[in-house]
Amino acid sequence: ASVEYDNEEDSPQIDARAHRPLDKRQEAAPTLRPVAPPISGTGYQPRPPKQDKQAMKKGPIIYPDAGGCKHPLDELGVLCPTGCELQTTLLKQEKTVKPVLRDLKDRVAKFSDTSTTMYQYVNMIDNKLVKTQKQRKDNDIILSEYNTEMELHYNYIKDNLDNNIPSSLRVLRAVIDSLHKKIQKLENAIATQTDYCRSPCVASCNIPVVSGRECEDIYRKGGETSEMYIIQPDPFTTPYRVYCDMETDNGGWTLIQNRQDGSVNFGRAWDEYKRGFGNIAKSGGKKYCDTPGEYWLGNDKISQLTKIGPTKVLIEMEDWNGDKVSALYGGFTIHNEGNKYQLSVSNYKGNAGNALMEGASQLYGENRTMTIHNGMYFSTYDRDNDGWLTTDPRKQCSKEDGGGWWYNRCHAANPNGRYYWGGTYSWDMAKHGTDDGIVWMNWKGSWYSMKKMSMKIKPYFPD
């Protein structure tokens, strides 16, 4: 018999028989058969007796189908399957197995793709988890810092509520009580002034007989008491009343401006500043007017006095603690109305700071230059001559700063500003949110209003 090969498996197939023929091309020569061992035993046993045929009958033995051929007799069981039978069986199985294998391969490929996708997704989730954990850690740190800060704020607020606010309330109550007393005092003063104005204007105190061109001339004529006098700078003008300070620096000072209690409103028009306004003096319990009132002498009168000869001006101020400073200008001239009462000052001495010539010492450069008063024209709310050049009519120094003055853009000094009790004030207290108090910035800054301020002039005599 010849050897056949299966095209599918490429393995030899041998025709099965009771013996296995030798394939000399692929197998070596068989070895010699060994000698059979001797038969063991001592002899035959006697024949057993016959048994009952019925007893000898056996039931059929059922063998499971092992996939091969059966013996003719069922008792002999299943023959060993031949190669052909195995091949046929395998071919039958192959038709079923191959689609299953292909399906399994497809499933394995899909599973592989799915596994790759899942791996990438897991990696992405892992990275996000790492980032989330880091972010959470950072958030925990920020939250901890925020909680710490909030606790500090809470403690600060609690401390203020427990300690500072009650103290501030006590201070405010004291301030309110003080203001109430001052209001009552002003109401009484207004009532007194109203009663006084109901009667014809007559001198309520004696006026000295001595008079002169100005207070220095009166001093030289023997008038050495500080009180109200009558002066006449030249024969062509009507005599008028002034207060003469005969004590400060050898006396002879003509008081041209005075602020001391807020009893007079200095937010006046051009013509009022031209003529003058306020109360020259009043009696302090004596028989003469020994106490100056609040007033502005008048631009025409001031201009005329400075034209008599070289004139100096002394500006004195006092804060609400009683501290005093002054600014002395050895040269002081006010030009006439045709020149808009232009201001000229020179030769500063004093400890208040040279606000009129140098501007506000807190400012620098152009901002400081804007606050210099020397050389400026006089301005009132109805006559804008300041250095604030703008097309907006609301932007006017005199309107915003409370009085008439030689404003630039706008001031370092504001003697004719609003009167604020207590000194310190703020933008929300001001009518226009500006520093409109009685200010001398070089001493107390913008937001401190003086208790007292005055301007006095006298002839200047070089040493």
Swiss-Prot record:
The modification Sulfotyrosine is found at Y5. Residues 1-56 are annotated as: Disordered. The record marks R17, A18 as: Cleavage. Residues 206-461 form the Fibrinogen C-terminal domain. The keyword Calcium applies. GO terms for molecular function: metal ion binding; protein-macromolecule adaptor activity; signaling receptor binding. Keywords: Blood coagulation, Calcium, Coiled coil, Disulfide bond, Glycoprotein, Hemostasis, Metal-binding, Secreted, Sulfation. InterPro entries: FIB_ANG-like, Fibrinogen-like_C, Fibrinogen_a/b/g_C_1, Fibrinogen_a/b/g_C_dom, Fibrinogen_a/b/g_coil_dom, Fibrinogen_CS. Cleaved by the protease thrombin to yield monomers which, together with fibrinogen alpha (FGA) and fibrinogen gamma (FGG), polymerize to form an insoluble fibrin matrix. Fibrin has a major function in hemostasis as one of the primary components of blood clots. Heterohexamer; disulfide linked. Contains 2 sets of 3 non-identical chains (alpha, beta and gamma). The 2 heterotrimers are in head to head conformation with the N-termini in a small central domain. This is Fibrinogen beta chain. It comes from Gallus gallus. The lineage of its organism: Eukaryota, Metazoa, Chordata, Craniata, Vertebrata.
